[in-house]
Amino acid sequence: MNADTAPFWRRKTLDQLDSKEWESLCDGCGLCCLQKLEDEEDNSVYYTSIACKLLDLQTCQCSDYPNRFKHVPDCIQLTPGKADQFKWLPPTCGYRLVSEGQDLPAWHHLVSGDRTQVHEQRISRSGRMLSENDVDEDDWEDHLIFRAG
């Protein structure tokens, strides 16, 4: 495949993407919306199976994406300018992969044309999460699922 016909994520840097291209890199896994805990001794970040109160536990989509910062002031906004901080994202994340110069996986909707693959391949935590509204914060350590990085 020559450079002119290569997909945009192979031809452009993150800073060159337009807003539609940027948003399309999101595979819809919802993992970035899981609550994370940081180990105070070594600064490791651990993902829990506890989801943000706005995350739909089946579709892995934010229930109020346009207004999320009003409801969750510390919601993380990914931008190309923060690419050097993407190491905390899951290794399957499109933003992280492209920022590291890697290709998107075969199941990613931009490659497969099928947005359900992220769930069918069990990349997302669809149906395997709990809402933060249902778990006391003191119990989050009981729900660790993987270490970031």
UniProtKB/Swiss-Prot annotation:
Pfam families for this protein: CxxCxxCC
Protein family according to the UniProt entry: Belongs to the UPF0260 family.
NCBIfam families: PRK05170.1-5, PRK05170.1-6, PRK05170.2-5
Record-given protein name: UPF0260 protein PSEEN4031
